[in-house]
Amino acid sequence: MAKDFLLEVGIEEMPARFLGPALTQLKEQTVKTLQELRIEYADIQTYGTPRRLVLYIKDLAENQAALEKEVKGPAKKAAFDAAGNPTKAILGFTRSQGVSMEDLVVRSIGQVEYLYALKREEGRPTAQVLAEICPGLIAGLHFPKPMRWGELELRFARPIRWLLALFGEAVVPFELANLQSNRFTYGHRFLSTGDLSIANPEDYFTKIRGAYVLIDPAERKELIWQQVQELATAEGGVVEKDEDLLDEITNILEWPTALCGTFDEDYLKLPGAVLVTPMREHQRYFPVVSNEGKLLNKFIAVRNGTRAYIEIVTAGNEKVLRARLADAAFFFEEDLKQPLASKVNGLQKVVFLEGLGSIADKVDRIGAMADHLAETLGANEEQRENIQRGALLAKADLITNMVYEFPELQGEMGREYALRNGEAPEVAEAIFEHYLPRFAGDLLPETLAGSVLSVADKMDSIVGCFAIGIQPTGSQDPYALRRQALGICHMLIEGNIHLSLRELVQWAYQGYHEGVELKQDLNQVITEIEEFFKQRLKGILNDRGLSYDTVDAVLTAGFDDIADVVDRGMALAAFRELPAFAALMTAFNRANNLAKHATTTQVQEVHLEHSAEQELYGLLTKLEGEVRPLLEQKNYALALQKIATIQSPLDTFFESVMVMVEDEAVKTNRLALLKKLVGLSMNVADFSKIVVETK
């Protein structure tokens, strides 16, 4: 008969970011362990709060499934003597395996027969197995910053304070961290007193809820959002759903109750970011805005408790926020006493990265590279002036009071101060936009100046890090180089900006000169960064639904122009839907295999002996004239359609002409013809990478 199993690990409050990954690990480890141990179950769920991790297994079998296995023994011919009697070899084997001669079977491996012992290992009681595996399931959880406590060797998110383990109504006995498992748990730290004796897993869920603990993070999150929306509506406003903030609040409490507070309307004169950042980032409050999106002097907080004394709690939150906003207002006013441009010289004292100079050096490099980009993209004089001014001021807000106190406001405060200093709106916007995108799914720059500065800034960081040997490895990417590379890719793709990746790397590399010692030469850096971007592009193309072989085909054909890669990939994906595509690929792959032997693409008409090759050459010459302009216009869909028209004459060519003939001149000419044909398609994709499914 199956029983439910419950494991609860009671701990001191852990950081919010630890909870989700811990519950995922706990479930995955349990699934893997039970599978290896042959213990069946109906369902596994994990729950948790900052004070507890809970594992619940529904209908866990009372015993392991029996294990039947075969153990290879000696060859049959070595197991019996001439009279058919067992030899010492087989007797020793049966004795070592604990089986009799009747438990042996014959199995053939190639031409040789071997004796195998049939063994059956009966399953052990699940209760015994659970007692053995529970310590490992808990100790096997990994946290970003585990800690030790007391004299223990165990490392965990926070000190473990109790262990509850029940299989049905029985305690599963084990010891960990000098604690013995039992049937006792504890409710909310302040709303529940004393321990709770749990009869069985079902009893746990009833009693823990009665002790003001909602153990299901999904339920807490839903309840919090519902309360927040109701309070915002009651105040005539709305709250923008911030998933990160919502998740963080969900994971720092056990019994959520939302409340609405207010602050002085005078603070609404400050820029919105100056108010929202302290609320969200420091106090974990939800700002309330009007239906038109205008910030109101309201905020919504969530307490870990009931509505008892809610007025006092609200007043306390208002007092704390009032102090935060007063500080922010002071910093803002102090920053305005000097123009943003006056901060630029101070950047010489701010280190960019050890070995790569100061932020002032980086600003100079960004300006130089931005000028290359502006010229390449055909920016007019006014645009180039705005780009250079934006480059000069891009990092100036790093040494303002506001950004020192709230680093996440870099760029936003630079834009605000630039506007108040009378800088051109295009310059101010570029200061903000050069940080975009900051994370997956973030905004992209909308202005030319913002895009140029963003690409220059990010490429400078990527090239500098690669040049001194700092590269992302595995899950480690301390300088967010992957994110910055993805940002460049998305900007170029979405903005339809056509630039050479190789030139970008060269320009950035050349910006590092006096006082900077680079460990790798330019060619090394180009090679490594090209591969780095290639991997990012693979992910982008896969996310757009392109098959792996379509991705390989377009990337093999080249990816120096990043925006161009996506255009070619989407055109090829659509081209693959044509009914005749498979037949075309068959012909092209045959041509490609032969073209590998070619040493030239120069076709000598005098050696075109057969009408089929003459017809193919004539059509190819005509197609080159039609396709080249389409490629220049990046009209890859039409270019591929034109290329497809060569299938029929190509099929005729292969049916009528022998390529690898003895006449060297004729053979060379035919190979050149095929190489020329394959080269035309290589402007879009390498068709040899396409996998054609045969039916």
Curated annotation (Swiss-Prot):
Enzyme Commission number(s): 6.1.1.14
KW Iron (keyword) present: no
Subcellular location: Cytoplasm
Keyword flag Protein biosynthesis: yes
Main EC class the enzyme belongs to: ligase
Sample GO molecular function, one term: ATP binding
Gene Ontology cellular-component annotations: cytosol
Catalytic activity: tRNA(Gly) + glycine + ATP = glycyl-tRNA(Gly) + AMP + diphosphate
InterPro entries xref list: DALR_anticod-bd, Gly-tRNA-synth_bsu, Gly-tRNA-synth_heterodimer
GO biological process entries: arginyl-tRNA aminoacylation; glycyl-tRNA aminoacylation
Pfam families: DALR_1 (PF05746), tRNA_synt_2f (PF02092)
Keywords: Aminoacyl-tRNA synthetase, ATP-binding, Cytoplasm, Ligase, Nucleotide-binding, Protein biosynthesis
Similarity comment: family membership: Belongs to the class-II aminoacyl-tRNA synthetase family.
Quaternary structure, from the entry: Tetramer of two alpha and two beta subunits.
Protein known as: Glycine--tRNA ligase beta subunit
Protein species of origin: Desulforamulus reducens (strain ATCC BAA-1160 / DSM 100696 / MI-1) (Desulfotomaculum reducens)
